[in-house]
Amino acid sequence: MSDVSVPLTFSDVAAAKVKTLIAEEENPNLKLRVYITGGGCSGFQYGFTFDEEVNEGDMTLVNDGVTLVVDPMSLQYLIGGIVDYTEGLEGSRFFINNPNATTTCGCGASFSV
């Protein structure tokens, strides 16, 4: 996939954290899978998990040697978004800066469109 048509951004900070976590797990086949499910206080919620598989139709992005995977259904809600990572007083977490979200919950884990 060329950079011109990439509908989602995988930040350098998030990629660095994924790289660290993969090294800790000692499994170079792991990829960060981002997905959307129904639920949460705003209607949809973000999910993050490690996966060794890339399914047919999945979009992949590579940054700093690590791979982000998104299924087609989830991608439609994430177009134009940024997958990022933060560490602060509230803890550390992956999050998505999603321009499609019309409302988000206080913790940023769920949204509506």
Swiss-Prot record:
InterPro entries: FeS_biogenesis, FeS_cluster_insertion, FeS_cluster_insertion_CS, FeS_cluster_insertion_RrpA, HesB-like_dom_sf. Disulfide bonds: none annotated. Signal peptide: none annotated. Keywords: Iron, Iron-sulfur, Metal-binding. Coiled coil: none annotated. GO terms for biological process: iron-sulfur cluster assembly. Its cofactor is iron-sulfur cluster. Binds 1 iron-sulfur cluster per subunit. Required for insertion of 4Fe-4S clusters for at least IspG. Homodimer. NCBIfam families: iron-sulfur cluster assembly accessory protein, PRK13623.1. This is Iron-sulfur cluster insertion protein ErpA. It comes from Aliivibrio salmonicida (strain LFI1238) (Vibrio salmonicida (strain LFI1238)). The lineage of its organism: Bacteria, Pseudomonadati, Pseudomonadota, Gammaproteobacteria, Vibrionales.
